[in-house]
Amino acid sequence: MSKVKRVYVEKQAPYAVKAKELKEEFASFLGIKTVTGVRVLVRYDIENLSDDTYQKSLNTVFSEPPVDTLYEEEFPYGESDRIFSVEYLPGQFDQRADSAEQCVRFLNENETPVIKTAMTYVIEGTVTDEQFESIKSFCINPVDSRETGMVKPETLVTVFDEPADVKIFDGFKDMAEAELKELYESLNLAMTFKDFLHIQNYFKNEENRDPSM
């Protein structure tokens, strides 16, 4: 079972400015006039947060009850609605997630939450597959974002593989040229043999040791 909790937050109709703008832009810029409604939800995936602090944060950190509607895990939508979600590319700074983590720590300084966000778009009306792809391209900036799936991850915590044992090239600095050439060819390196010779000279004369990788 996933340790990750998921929350969707949607602006209530009077405050859903972005959703209204997108509907108009799909018609004016993309020429798609069959979209009858657009919904925009902020998706929060949350891990490493106690149940008590999680409950406190729902209507303080993740949503504002007067203007937002909050859904836990899933949200209602029509059978014919088209849905897609957009997340930041790995390495891109997620300002919304960072702010949420800081706000949670204000509620409880002992918490160390991991939060990841995405934007979920619901397209209501009748659109073809081609039109839907145009809508996705319009909403996704490939420089910093990408489409992401709807399946909740098992964890948000990144686990790095244990590094492989370091290999020492015994005898490298004192190898004869013929033996060195044989090693060079076996490694398929993106350098010339002349460069490889320079490396040997460096380890022999400067480092006085065999290299590792």
Give the label of every model feature segment:
Residues M1-M213:
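Core nucleic-acid recognition elements
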